[in-house]
Design a protein with these regions (language model features):
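Short S/T/G/P-rich N-terminal loop/turn motif that feeds into the first structured element of a domain
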Residues: 2-74, 84-90, 103-177
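Conserved RNP beta-strands of RNA recognition motif
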Residues: 77-79
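Metal-dependent nucleotidyltransferase catalytic core
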Residues: 92-98
Length: 177
């Protein structure tokens, strides 16, 4: 299991690696089908975005977000950049992000930096960490590859985990249907 702790950086400057998560909400059936298709079709375009390092395309879950039932209206793009200026410029000017914005009824990008990172993602260590011990909002990205023999055990625990997340007063953002 990999866990990555990221700090929200509303005004980050300098040459620190920046991590962005861009969320897109799609309203019509047509735009939702477009977004789903882009999970496969955007790969070639993402690798050509100027300045992008590691990147991943995400779907989202429904209700408390941690369920096997997908939320077909919200998708996200996680990416690393060498600095904030490159991230902002590429997010604004690249054709693929412009297409996502054109299709979406709502979009939001969070700029962050990695505080800690443990494990690999697709065989890579995607985040350069710069521990700052900052007080403020944190984003935690947890991902895992599940072995088939562990699936039943994993999904049995999901309802309790979802309930804990949903009732935690410290959770300031979650994707709703």
């Amino acid at each position: 299991m990999c866990q990555h702790i990221l700090t929200h950086l509303p005004g980050a400057q300098g040459m620190t690696q920046i991590v962005t998560i861009s969320f897109f909400r799609f309203g019509s059936v047509r735009s939702r089908l477009w977004a789903f298709a882009m999970m496969g079709l955007a790969r070639g375009q993402m690798s050509r975005v100027p300045g992008v390092g590691f990147w991943k395309l995400f779907g989202s879950g429904s209700n408390e977000g941690f369920t096997p039932k997908p939320n077909v209206s919200v998708y996200a793009v996680l990416a690393t950049w060498p600095d904030r200026q490159t991230a902002a410029r590429s997010l604004q000017q690249s054709a693929i992000f412009a297409r996502y914005r054109q299709q979406a009824i709502e979009n939001w990008t969070v700029f962050m930096k990695a505080e800690t990172a443990r494990g690999k993602w697709s065989g890579q260590t995607p985040f350069s960490t710069t521990p700052q011990n900052q007080n403020g909002p944190l984003a935690v990205i947890t991902r895992a590859t599940l072995r088939p023999r562990k699936l039943a055990q994993f999904w049995r625990r999901v309802p309790n985990i979802s309930q804990v997340i949903g009732q935690d007063p410290n959770v300031v953002f979650k994707i709703e249907n």
